[in-house]
From Swiss-Prot:
Originating gene: zdhhc16b
Keywords: Acyltransferase, Endoplasmic reticulum, Membrane, Transferase, Transmembrane, Transmembrane helix
Lineage: Eukaryota, Metazoa, Chordata, Craniata, Vertebrata
Role this protein plays: Palmitoyl acyltransferase that mediates palmitoylation of proteins and is required during embryonic heart development. Involved in the proliferation of neural stem cells by regulating the FGF/ERK pathway.
Bilayer disposition of the protein: Multi-pass membrane protein
Similarity comment: family membership: Belongs to the DHHC palmitoyltransferase family.
InterPro entries on file: Palmitoyltrfase_DHHC, PFA4/ZDH16/20/ERF2-like
Membrane topology, Lumenal segments: 97-107, 218-275
Name of the protein in its database record: Palmitoyltransferase ZDHHC16B
Positions annotated as active site in the UniProt record: 183 (s-palmitoyl cysteine intermediate)
Compartment(s) of residence: Endoplasmic reticulum membrane
Transmembrane stretches, start-end: 76-96, 108-130, 197-217, 276-296
GO cellular component terms, semicolon-separated: endoplasmic reticulum membrane; Golgi apparatus
Length: 382
């Protein structure tokens, strides 16, 4: 008969063997899962991995449906924005002719009348001309057939070579020569052949809004005070609380035998007052907003950049700064020369005939090749 010691030792051996096998089996399972995970990652990265992929690329992929929606909606809303610009501009012109000019004719001296007539009509002509040309002029497209023109890179959307300073517009779905941006207010891209028209429209529209805001300031104050006084008298005649030295309640319950006093202003006068207030508020708001946009584009023109190139050059400047190198914009010809190239000015008299008067002259160059200063480095903005 076996002793109890032998039974205990047998049980202990079984426990030790079980504890010895369990880690091995668990380790074998974990190793199998790890192998499957590594194999899946190898397959996934072999199909989708790109060394250029970063967080910006991932965010672009995530927001691609939103970009698609914005691009397609902007294309359709461009017509609405163009109609809105035409309607607002026409309303200002009508108010000036019907409300402002009669006041000027009746109260201003002759030389001021001549000044307002000459400057106002010249500014209106420049605004209408440049807006029409900016909306109807094609920005410029690279040739589709094979040419000997040097190209910088390949468009990822069109899969065709594109020259320097050419970029793809996702709204127009085409490559644009010297693309600046897509303007929904023009329903058109701003590129090489209509960039001057766009900036001139912004400049003269800002000047026109500033002119209307300054000229109609006194008329606006008088109209606003008249509207407020009309509200005061109307509220008083109806027994409403009116502002004054405290809140005074005027009641005519005990004066039923008296007739309602006539209104302080006729319907036509009230419409004139409201029109003048609308004119001043609209032109002042547009002058501030559009003036800031015009100033920003003027800074870009002074630097010899477009809106797209500004972001590209900023990234290149940071990248080269980390390497201890200096980035220079290869299309920067100096401040004055940048403006001459932009406006297409070749001689001194061109500043009058091509800038201060309506002109349909084409820009300098064909938008395919560009002259770069002698000091340019090997780094170019693409």
């Amino acid at each position: 008969m076996r002793s109890w010691r032998w039974s205990v030792s047998r049980i202990m051996r079984l426990f030790l063997r079980w504890f010895r096998l369990c880690p091995r089996r668990g380790h074998r399972k974990r190793s199998r899962v790890r192998d499957l995970w590594n194999y899946g990652m190898v397959v996934l990265k072999s199909l989708y991995y790109n060394v250029q992929t970063n967080s910006d690329t991932v965010l672009d992929c995530m927001f691609e449906p939103i970009y698609w929606l914005v691009d397609n909606m902007t294309r359709w809303f461009g017509v609405v924005f163009v109609c809105l610009v035409m309607a607002l501009t026409s309303s200002v012109v009508v108010i000036v002719y019907l409300c402002v000019l009669p006041i000027i004719f009746s109260s201003y001296p002759v030389y001021w009348i001549l000044w307002h007539l000459c400057y106002g009509h010249w500014n209106l002509l420049m605004v209408v001309f440049h807006y029409y040309k900016a909306t109807t002029t094609q920005p410029g497209f690279p040739p589709q057939e094979k040419t000997d023109i040097p190209t910088v890179t390949i468009c990822k959307k069109c899969i065709v070579p594109k020259p320097a300073r050419t970029h793809h517009c996702s709204i127009c779905n085409r490559c644009i020569l010297k693309m600046d941006h897509h303007c929904p207010w023009l329903n058109n891209c701003v590129g090489h052949f209509n960039h001057r028209y766009f900036f001139s429209f912004c400049l003269f529209m800002t000047m026109g809004c500033v002119y209307c805001s300054i000229s109609a300031k006194d008329m606006f104050l008088d109209a606003y005070n008249a509207i407020e006084s009309g509200r005061y008298k109307g509220g008083a005649s109806q027994g409403e609380a009116v502002p004054g030295a405290g809140l005074i309640y005027i009641s005519f319950q005990h004066q039923s035998s008296y007739q309602t006093p006539p209104p302080a202003f006729t319907h036509q006068e009230r419409m004139v007052h409201k029109s003048l207030v609308y004119l001043w508020v609209l032109t002042s708001s547009v002058a501030v907003a559009l003036g800031a946009l015009t100033l920003w584009h003027a800074i870009l023109i002074t630097r010899g950049e477009t809106s797209v190139e500004r972001h590209i050059n900023r990234k290149e400047r940071r990248r080269l700064k980390l390497r201890g190198k200096l980035f220079r914009n290869p299309y920067h010809h100096g401040r004055i020369n940048n403006w001459r190239i932009f406006f297409g000015v070749e001689k001194g008299s061109d500043w009058l005939w091509r800038v201060l008067l309506p002109s349909t002259h084409p820009p300098l160059g064909d938008g395919l090749t560009w002259d770069c200063p002698a000091y340019k480095s090997s780094t170019t903005a693409i």
